[in-house]
From Swiss-Prot:
Top EC class, one word: transferase
Organism: Bifidobacterium longum subsp. longum (strain ATCC 15707 / DSM 20219 / JCM 1217 / NCTC 11818 / E194b)
Transmembrane segments: none
Reactions that this protein is recorded to catalyse: beta-D-galactosyl-(1->3)-N-acetyl-D-glucosamine + phosphate = alpha-D-galactose 1-phosphate + N-acetyl-D-glucosamine
GO molecular function terms attached to this record: 1,3-beta-galactosyl-N-acetylhexosamine phosphorylase activity; 1,4-alpha-oligoglucan phosphorylase activity
Protein family according to the UniProt entry: Belongs to the glycoside hydrolase 112 family.
Keywords, comma-separated and alphabetical: Carbohydrate metabolism, Glycosyltransferase, Transferase
Name recorded for this polypeptide: 1,3-beta-galactosyl-N-acetylhexosamine phosphorylase
Length: 751
């Protein structure tokens, strides 16, 4: 039996009958168009709520082609060119996609551009270089031979990056490229608002304006071979203009350099420790963006329509987790559901009436092709999202893309029917209330609340070799029975640590925004965390936590005394490090499966092989059972009182340390898996001295999780796999109940 509501269906031209059929099958109460599509009159007449995608700053080439100096701009960094004499020529566009980017020759290059000696870091005097505009080459004189040089130059963005991606992915052939425009320019800003006002008048059947999105695209640049060159889902690189730079200088009292944007080629990645110029630009940009977003929302309301923001594409500057977002007047936020982390990124946004998730797969040919089974991805996506939804509900769900593609796959159609019904059933049973969280966990990094659920990310929901060992922290937490918040080092320095926090997690590689970089040289930060843990708090470090970029004070991890582990940075090799025996059985590792033969061999090896001499050593036979991801090399216990739980290959992967009334725990890495989510859950309960609370509402099988809803007197058990699972759930009174769950299954019981 299909229930109805809470579902948004995409449609397109000449597909009215099938749209009606699928709307009934999936219980859709709203219909939307997708990029490049329109809704038929017959679809508009179905009586469903109508979402209409609106692109404020593209799809009007008739305007922008007459004002090509008012497209968005970006500072680009050329390749490094080696000087072999006292002159060097630097080509501007050699590694950039000329259909997307075009050098800005209109604004004075000597005012807005920069030539830098990358060997010394010095800026080359503007008198020593000239621009050959015909060849897009900068000629530099008076340089030092065997030094590398670059040009940081302004470029117009002449093809909307999202439309470009869709164009290239779907092979749209000779379809006209949509040129974006920048509302920072008064004439273009007036055009945008005048156009929107007319669109509102011309769209009486639209109920929800689905802004996709607003004004500035996250950093997405392609190279000369039409490949992705630079991507940063949080990047503000594509937000620049000479006018904005001049206004920034007038407001903040200093002038931004091109280097403040290109950042030596890092383009201010969210992984970089944020600097003052970067933070100031974000504040400047978000102030401007939000002022104009509010005007669009107010216009939507005046026309009797809701204003919905898509969290993606041109979302830069909206900053949904920055204070004041609730003042913009937006009714809703919708975003792409890639996994549990991105689900929470949407669900936890404050200040809107409702949130909506656009589930995967997207109805595009790269997934919906003959021989593929998109239902596999659909269920996998649902399982990842479901565990997060139970912890922080989203109000609605839907899909995107071309419905005509999805309709050709009957198994997928049936899968979505099941998912939609289950989604609504969860809401009906819980009333949209989150499951109970048993601990309060804080993620500590440079960004804090402003980047809630956005840590350890480069591209949306796409972990890679350098990130997956840390991204798994968020993915594990997204569906765990804990309450999660994000705090910054500035928060701790200014206000201390909130009294209701049970555990703080700091993790990531050295010298990144997520571990903190030089902030750990501030003794007040170290004092505050130490005192808090000593008094009964819990600190969990992952990877290279609390690491200072340079070896100093005899420590690399500045809180090595708290977590019981430090990392050898080749400065103290002449000092022996001794490893205590690894503890084979512990509360933290109670659910870790270990092959009996491996355990026997490990025990016969005496738990460890102590190697005196430089660097010490440990355990030639690993106990195994845990995936720590990319190895963190040369970690060692700071003393022999540290409890080692895994220490393979001469370094520590998992350890605990008593610290006064509190505890520290070290984990070298945590890729997401059910086993690792269970491991982290046990770490959090142990570190916070809450072992006695762990059993209630726990599942014996890590592949299954329990969500308790005390207000409703209910609990559910979910199977997070595509295989049947058995588990035993322990209730609050210590009794147990057995469950036999089908693949992807969910079971409800009265609590």
């Amino acid at each position: 039996m299909t229930s109805t509501g809470r579902f948004t269906l995409p449609s397109e031209e000449n597909f009215a009958e099938k749209t009606k059929e699928l709307a009934e099958l999936w219980g859709a109460d709203a219909i939307r168009n997708s990029d490049g599509t329109h809704l038929d009159e017959a679809v508009l007449a179905l009586g469903k709520k109508i979402y209409n995608a609106y692109f404020p700053t593209r799809a009007h080439n008739e305007w922008i082609t007459l004002h090509m100096d008012e497209t968005p701009q970006v500072y680009l960094l050329t390749d490094r060119i080696l000087a072999e004499s006292d002159t060097v020529d630097i080509p501007l566009m050699e590694s950039f996609f000329a259909e997307q980017l075009k050098p800005n020759r209109d604004a004075d290059p000597h005012k807005y551009w920069e030539v830098v000696d990358r060997t010394t870091g010095e800026v080359v005097d503007s008198a020593n270089w000239t621009l050959d505009a015909d060849e897009d080459t900068v000629h530099v004189s008076g340089v030092a031979a065997w030094h590398e040089y670059t040009v940081s130059f302004l470029a117009y963005i002449i093809w909307d990056p999202v439309e470009m991606y869709n164009h290239l992915t779907n092979d749209w052939g000779d379809k006209e490229h949509e040129i974006p425009f920048d509302i920072y320019h008064p004439a273009t800003r007036k055009f945008v608002f005048d156009t929107f006002e007319q669109w509102l008048k011309d769209s009486p059947q639209t109920d929800v304006v689905r802004f996709t999105t607003f004004f500035y695209q996250f950093t997405l640049l392609f190279d000369e071979k039409r490949r992705e060159k630079v991507v940063d889902w949080f990047g503000c690189a594509c937000t620049v203009s000479p006018r904005a730079l001049d206004d920034f200088e007038a407001k903040y009292g200093y002038r931004l350099r091109p280097e403040d944007f290109v950042d030596g080629g890092a383009y201010n990645s969210a992984w970089r420790v944020p600097r003052k110029a970067q933070r100031d630009w974000i504040d400047f940009l978000s102030g401007f963006v939000r002022e104009n977003v509010k005007q669009l929302a107010d216009m939507s309301h005046a026309a009797g329509k809701e204003a919905m923001m898509f969290l993606g594409d041109q979302w830069i500057g909206t900053e949904p987790y920055k204070d004041g977002f609730d003042e913009l007047g937006l009714d809703a936020v919708v975003g792409s559901i890639g996994d549990g982390t991105t689900t929470r990124m949407i669900a936890d946004i404050p200040g809107v009436k409702y949130t909506e998730g656009r589930f995967l797969p997207y109805f595009f040919p790269d997934t919906f092709y003959e021989g593929n089974d998109p239902s596999i991805e659909g269920l996998d996506n649902w399982r990842k999202a479901r565990r997060a939804i139970l912890r922080s509900p989203i109000s609605r769900m839907g899909y995107g893309g071309y419905l005509s593609l999805a309709a050709k796959f009957p198994k997928f159609v049936d899968t979505v029917t099941h998912i939609a019904n289950e989604f609504r059933d969860i809401h009906d049973r819980t009333g949209g209330v989150a499951a109970e969280g048993e601990l309060n966990v804080a993620i500590l990094n440079s960004w804090g609340k402003m980047r809630s659920w956005m840590a350890f990310t480069v591209a949306h929901a796409l972990p890679n070799k350098q990130t997956y060992s840390y991204y798994g922290i968020l993915e594990s937490l997204s569906g765990m029975r804990v309450n999660v918040r994000f705090i910054s080092f500035d928060d701790v320095l200014a206000h201390g640590i909130d009294s209701d926090i049970d555990v703080i997690i700091n993790g990531g590689p050295v010298d990144t925004a997520f571990t903190g970089g030089d902030v750990w040289t501030n003794p007040k930060l170290v004092e505050t965390v130490r005192a808090w843990v000593r008094g009964g708090g819990a600190f969990v470090g992952v990877g290279e936590p609390s690491s200072a970029p340079r070896f100093q004070t005899g420590r690399f991890f500045q809180l090595a005394d708290v977590i019981g582990v430090d990392e050898e940075r080749y400065q103290t090799l002449s000092v022996d490090k001794y490893f205590p025996p690894v503890v084979p059985d512990h509360f933290i590792t109670a659910d870790v499966p270990v092959d009996p033969a491996a355990r026997e061999a490990w025990e016969q090896a005496g738990y460890r092989i102590p190697l005196s001499g430089c660097g010490g050593g440990q355990s030639i036979k690993p106990l195994g059972g845990i995936d720590f991801g990319e190895p963190v090399l040369n970690t060692y216990p700071v003393n022999e009182n540290v409890t080692l739980l895994r220490a393979d290959g001469g370094q520590v992967q998992l350890a605990t340390n008593d610290y006064g009334k509190g505890r520290g725990v070290y984990i070298s890495g945590l890729p997401y898996s059910a086993a690792n989510a269970r491991l982290l859950e046990r770490v959090l309960f142990y570190a916070s001295h809450n072992e006695d609370k762990y059993a209630a509402w726990s599942s014996s099988n890590p592949e299954c999780e329990v969500a308790h809803f005390p207000e409703q007197g209910l609990y559910c058990v979910i199977n997070n796999t595509d295989q049947p699972q058995k588990t035993t759930v322990t209730l609050a009174d210590g009794t147990t109940e057995d469950f036999d769950l089908p693949d992807s299954g969910i079971a409800w019981r009265e609590a």
